[in-house]
Amino acid sequence: MSPQTETKASVGFKAGVKDYKLTYYTPDYETKDTDILAAFRVTPQPGVPPEEAGAAVAAESSTGTWTTVWTDGLTSLDRYKGRCYGLEPVAGEENQYIAYVAYPLDLFEEGSVTNMFTSIVGNVFGFKALRALRLEDLRIPPAYSKTFQGPPHGIQVERDKLNKYGRPLLGCTIKPKLGLSAKNYGRAVYECLRGGLDFTKDDENVNSQPFMRWRDRFLFCAEALYKAVAETGEIKGHYLNATAGTCEEMIKRAVFARELGVPIVMHDYLTGGFTANTSLAHYCRDNGLLLHIHXXXXXXXXXXKNHGMHFRVLAKALRMSGGDHVHAGTVVGKLEGERDITLGFVDLLRDDFIEKDRSRGIYFTQDWVSLPGVLPVASGGIHVWHMPALTEIFGDDSVLQFGGGTLGHPWGNAPGAVANRVAVEACVQARNEGRDLAREGNXIIREAS
């Protein structure tokens, strides 16, 4: 019997509310290699001690409930409880702490991102002892990450499939995102790919609306794709959005895409759901499709500074659930991103091993062992003059996506695509020759044009 069950049996069962910190705050706990570790930014209500707030998070996201229940005596809580093992005040913030919580591996179902999130962030966010709570980072132990398939193909396999090396890949979201007929939509796809882009993309809201049903769009885009491939001699792709109202319909669209022979499909991973995403990722690996992930609705969870969860947590979850590309902010352009922090989670997506580095927002050393990498996608308000900065920041293993930055070209879509391709090749060449992109960027672009 564990010490806990013993005391309970001998003293008799006492109901009533008790402080979480008596059971769940364990500052001398040594974390195990198999524990899932979480860093929460906790803002306790006035009068609630930080230890109690941290312990409350550990309790409510693992075995605890608001009172002592007699069924606690039927299990070994010491084996299954989450533990708040560290607290540190956040510099420059009043009454804000980083609480470190360790969860035993047995609390989680293998291969289920859905269950991991339900457990860790399922019901702690409405907790009344806390004014605000934000999940900043997770450490996923290899013992858990090995139960996931991960990205369908990963960076290296994708480059081999596309036969494109040594430069960032170029994409473009087809605009206007809603209202074009399938035929005109296909025409825009053809012009962009013909001009020199590697990919074009369905906007995340394009599913199957009255003005353009999914099957028509898939057909016309495939036609555009093959025409552009035949004329340029390069392998190209269009992210066909398979997101749908049911998982069955989503898989049906992915199957149709595979039958057309296209290389890549797309999914909105937050609105579609983790479960649907993992199913689609498995289908994609089994059938040789690349999978582009759009994180629509990310800002709902990730935008507030002290509540919700940081994007790097969603990025880690996505690498486990599966996706070959994921949108990751830009550092420049219209969507926000601080440079070091963005680079932090870009590395989490691409690299096998990432050292703890608080200046980049990385709270734990993360070892992905052999899980394939994900290509970060920079998109949102970027255009050709951002190219030197983007090449420097994101490096070769990335997809740079210009929507309005291609289609907004005064001469039309194809010249816009040409401009982007010329710019990226000029930047890569200049970088390889040892020139300073940050300083000479504009000059490099001018020379190229």
UniProtKB/Swiss-Prot annotation:
Catalysis performed (reactions)? 2 (2R)-3-phosphoglycerate + 2 H(+) = D-ribulose 1,5-bisphosphate + CO2 + H2O; D-ribulose 1,5-bisphosphate + O2 = 2-phosphoglycolate + (2R)-3-phosphoglycerate + 2 H(+)
Q: In the record's cofactor note, how is the cofactor described as bound?
A: Binds 1 Mg(2+) ion per subunit.
> What does the entry list as the binding residues for Mg(2+)?
K201, D203, E204
The EC category is lyase
Gene Ontology MF annotations: magnesium ion binding; monooxygenase activity; ribulose-bisphosphate carboxylase activity
Q: How is it modified after translation?
A: The disulfide bond which can form in the large chain dimeric partners within the hexadecamer appears to be associated with oxidative stress and protein turnover.
What family is reported?
Belongs to the RuBisCO large chain family. Type I subfamily.
What the protein does? RuBisCO catalyzes two reactions: the carboxylation of D-ribulose 1,5-bisphosphate, the primary event in carbon dioxide fixation, as well as the oxidative fragmentation of the pentose substrate in the photorespiration process. Both reactions occur simultaneously and in competition at the same active site.
Kindly provide the name given to this protein in its UniProt entry. Answer: Ribulose bisphosphate carboxylase large chain
The organism is: Salacia pallescens
Q: Which gene encodes it?
A: rbcL
